[in-house]
Amino acid sequence: MKLYNLKDHNEQVSFAQAVTQGLGKNQGLFFPHDLPEFQLTDIDELLKQDFVTRSTKILSAFIGDEIPKELLEERVRAAFAFPAPVKQVEPDVGCLELFHGPTLAFKDFGGRFMAQMLTHISGDKPVTILTATSGDTGAAVAHAFYGLKNVRVVILYPKGKISPLQEKLFCTLGGNIETVAIDGDFDACQALVKQAFDDEELKAALGLNSANSINISRLLAQICYYFEAVAQLPQEARNQLVVSVPSGNFGDLTAGLLAKSLGLPVKRFIAATNANDTVPRFLKDGKWAPNATQATLSNAMDVSQPNNWPRVEELFRRKIWRLSDLGYAAVTDETTKATMRELKAVGYTSEPHAAIAYRALRDSLQPGEYGLFLGTAHPAKFKESVEAILGETLPLPKELAERADLPLLSHELPADFAALRKLMMTRG
């Protein structure tokens, strides 16, 4: 597989290089040189296969012979060890639930596949993953790499600034997972990570990798669950399918569009955002004008400069698609709350991100169309806000309940690079 840097097309790398490097020069994103396409008969055959077999074929179409098919299938089986069911919400609407993995969020798919790829590519060479988190990413990375050989994971998070449930999810693992509560905010944690990657001696000594969410391996993994969704739909729904994607950094939408590029039958996509509406405004008037980021109920989408957007534009350019065909909607917190109650009234418990995707879908769905919206996180991950909005108590899923009483294993450090460096070098 060949990929090129969107900021410098002369920089071309293999799949293995893109996975280990993460980003290209000038923080450029990598994009596939070749965009494979399946014939209609191939799509029909793919949709009859099981999740792992189908996903292996999809990933193999991109990765090529860089990873032998048998090995790839083995790694896919290890990564995608949980379902992605479509739950019927209304006669013409379903939710693709992506929260049945170990950390109850869609990031489990990309995180676990990236972990499998990185450990294969690194072989026996020790790797240290260093990343900062405000919650979800840390949990997905921790569980994805937990127990893998020759990998040490160090996760920084702002002390006292993530929910107790989130903290329990990834700070109770131990083993090869080290968590560090930093006396500062998320920006302070990110600054420490940046300093570590600027330290050539530390980088070389520990084999540092960031496991960043824009890693190409995570993006390719996400394509697979769009096919899994369509495979569960009756033929009449497949013919008139509209997909609504809750969008923050736009990785999920990019993956869906790549699935369409492969030949998956999707009539149109909708980019659903909260009040951080840079993309909806751009699609409306053609002006890219990010505002200051606003805090909302759907905090995972509080992004005003989505870093995957250049990949969306590149795909539309390469496929000669029109951006004007991409649906969009920006949903306020008040409408999000009302929509969560509306969904509850038809028997479906949702959280803010999925509710936004549903609202954008419901408001634009035409007669005869079938709508699918993405459920990216388990409602219990937003227990406090969901309970307050719906006026009822949510039971804790076992993934959260079984960790609730475990002791936290985190180190505590000031927001000081020398202290972090010492910890990493003495334990490395």
Predicted feature locations:
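PLP-dependent amino-acid enzyme catalytic core
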Residues: 1-428
